[in-house]
Amino acid sequence: MATITIEPATSPRWDDVQHALSGGGDGRSCQCIWPVVRNKVWQTTTLDERRDMLQAEIAAGPPPGLVAYVGDEAAGWIRVGPRTVQQRILHTRAIVAATTEPLDDDSAWAVTCFVVRREHRGQGLNGRLLASALDYARESGARLLEAYPVDTSTGSHRSNDLYHGTVSTFLAAGFELGPTLTAGRVLVTRGLAD
């Protein structure tokens, strides 16, 4: 079995980020820009513009996500960072109503996206990405990590709808269940002092 490693998404890893995002699902077309822009911007941007936005975000630093490698192949991605730079969180009514954290608190971070290439699914990469995201957030000064995963116990879901992650993955990583956001989605949190 190939070794799995997780690394920050930095400019030298740009091609790997693109490889991880392009292996099935909406990652290639989204470029993981959905969490950081409002609807009006999202609806008026092209794939090339989204790609440029992500590349600029990575170049500016700090890394907005992590890349999972299976051997030497970029196989997965997770977006993790302060909620304050993920504009969609700040303007999603269900999240704003459910969170108990101040929206302007830079120490409250969020996981908002997972992508795993089709050929690497079913190997536990989401769990590995999440564990590394916890470490990365803690090392970067975050005191709390929040997420908005899908509750797969409520029925079947298309794989493209699981980019938020699943409740079971977060619970296995020590997150606590919070309020329901919408049908099939909940808020989960984990303090990072431990």
Predicted regions and their residues:
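Conserved N-terminal entry element of GNAT/NAT acetyltransferase domains
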Residues: 1-39
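Conserved acyl-donor/pantetheine-binding loop and adjacent beta-alpha core of acyl/acetyltransferases
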Residues: 56, 60, 74-117, 121, ...
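C-terminal "cap" of GNAT-fold acetyltransferases
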Residues: 160-194
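Short, solvent-exposed beta-strand-terminating loops
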Residues: 20-23, 78-89, 135-137, 144
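Conserved beta-hairpin
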Residues: 17, 63-78
